[in-house]
């Protein structure tokens, strides 16, 4: 016999409601295409709206670990652009059931993902920006970028977006490196490049405590440059290492 340990914890709605009600901090749940039918998504959004959680980020989600490409749920949204449309429709009082009598309008502010070094499945950055523009046309209000470690990539991306006619705010996404393993993990998993100077510094580090400090200092310098350039908001990917972000 094998003992099964089950750890119970609140779901997304419960956690977000707790954050807002207990700490008066706006929660921004990620709404995914993967694993949800359109009906599931609508029900989730109705709950969030009722609780006053009106900021969301619409994402497609990744392929499952044992699959090579993303497969949408049957009767679910296949692309983030479709998910944005569904949320935007609710903002206009348009529900899946057109005959619904209590179809009150929601008031979601919708964020989407952008990729300064292009999405790993996109053939080029230009084509990726084309699809990003579609998400904006469908109702997205702002963009949060994938992590990057060279600020020039972010500034070039913003310039390309503006040239393409994208005018919504673009929030830079940052991640402090914390371990030597991440030198291989981050480029492979997120399809981003690490600057040579950062790689060499991490390779020479005597242990992960030293790596952690290098990652904090690198990310802090990025942050200072971005703020100096006029960016009003920065987004940090903690990925279970909140103390690193807190140090920054």
Residue ranges and their predicted role:
Residues 1-4, 30-34, 61-62, 113-119, ...:
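Active-site beta-loop-alpha junctions enriched in small/polar residues
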Residues 37-49, 127-131, 156-159, 179-185, ...:
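Catalytic cores of alpha/beta
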Residues 38-45, 123-134, 215-225:
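Short, acidic/polar
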Residues 23-27, 52-54, 106-108, 140-141, ...:
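Short, well-ordered coil/turn segments that N-cap beta-strands
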Residues 1-15, 64-75, 140-156, 238-241:
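Glycine-rich, proline-tolerant flexible connector loops at the mouths of alpha/beta enzymes
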Residues 48, 135, 139, 172, ...:
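Conserved, mostly hydrophobic/aromatic
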Residues 74-105, 112-121, 128, 159, ...:
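Active-site pocket-lining/capping segments in soluble small-molecule metabolic enzymes
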Residues 38-86:
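Flexible, glycine-rich active-site loops centered on histidine and acidic residues
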């Amino acid at each position: 016999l094998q003992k099964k340990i089950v750890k119970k914890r609140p779901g997304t709605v419960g956690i977000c409601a707790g954050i807002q009600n207990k700490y008066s901090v706006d929660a921004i749940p990620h709404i995914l295409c993967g694993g949800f039918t359109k009906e599931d998504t609508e029900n989730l959004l109705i709950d969030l709206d009722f609780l006053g959680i009106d900021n969301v980020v619409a994402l497609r989600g990744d392929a499952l670990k044992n699959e090579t490409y993303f497969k949408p749920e049957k009767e679910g949204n296949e692309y983030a652009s479709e998910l944005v449309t569904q949320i935007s429709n609710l903002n206009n009082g348009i529900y899946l059931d057109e005959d619904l009598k209590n179809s009150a309008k929601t008031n979601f502010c919708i964020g989407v993902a952008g990729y300064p070094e292009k999405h790993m499945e996109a053939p080029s950055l230009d084509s990726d920006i084309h699809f990003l523009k579609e998400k904006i046309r469908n109702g997205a209000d702002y963009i949060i970028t994938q992590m990057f470690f060279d600020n020039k990539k972010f500034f070039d991306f913003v310039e390309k977006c503006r040239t393409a006619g994208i005018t919504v705010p673009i929030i830079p996404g940052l991640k402090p490196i914390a371990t030597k393993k991440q030198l291989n993990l981050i480029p492979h998993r997120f399809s981003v490049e690490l600057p040579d100077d950062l790689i060499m510094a991490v390779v020479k580090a005597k242990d992960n405590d030293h790596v952690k400090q290098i990652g904090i200092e690198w990310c802090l310098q990025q942050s200072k440059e971005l703020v100096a350039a006029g960016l009003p908001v920065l987004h940090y990917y903690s990925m279970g290492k909140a103390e690193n972000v807190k140090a920054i």
